[in-house]
Amino acid sequence: LLLLISCDMEQEVEIKLPPHESQLVVECYLEPGKPLRAVVLESVSYFNNPQLPLVPDAEVFITHNGQTVRLAFSPFQDRKTGKYFTHRYNKPLDLKTGDVVTIEVKDKKDRRVTGSTTILNRVPIEAVEWKFNEKEKAYLLTSFQDDPDAENYYRYMTHRDSIGHGSQRDFVSNDKLTNGKRVSYGSSYDYEKGDTLIVSLYHIEKEYYDFLNSISDAKNANGNPFAQPSRIVSSVQGGIGIFTNLAYERKTVIIQ
């Protein structure tokens, strides 16, 4: 009888979700001496099939030192890195440390995304070292000096053979506990003699640091019923995404 009563009490509840309102998604990284490239897409509902919705009518403008350039819609893949872009301008900007650069993206739906970035200085890598254990496996140690007069944020990456492949290490950090000190990033005993490693140290803005952390949180929460939903922390206004500059030092070493 109790089982029958329990069955009678079951009800199907239909949850009505608000309609998804698509936003412009912008990703643009400035590199000194490199052409201007950007990705502009459109957000889709979580329940939609995976897709990359292009926005052909989106216009991208970048302003530096009072001069504005327009990035043309011209989708392509960078053969070196394997990354895709939707807009480009082939002439690099003459970027100096401390320069402020702005971006504006708009389309025919009257959507508008804006953002700004301040060009940072590169932080030199002082040493890339390795040491073998008794099993002939080596760990990697990368060292640099933190500036005591600034609040600094870093991204550290290592690749094997090519930056076009997935990174072996990729993490962000700040100098709250290491301000003004010599900082060293280590690894596990992952390497052997003859391995070619590409080490990259990025000096990044706090906005990019927060963006990367939020991306990591969102990946960890995706599909996990026990995780809190995670919101992407954007550096742009009016949409989703990141506009920043990449100031990095890169070294290639062969483990010997």
Where are these regions (language model features)?
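A sequence/structural signal for flexible, mid-protein segments enriched
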Residues: 7-256
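Sec-dependent bacterial lipoprotein signal peptides
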Residues: 1-5
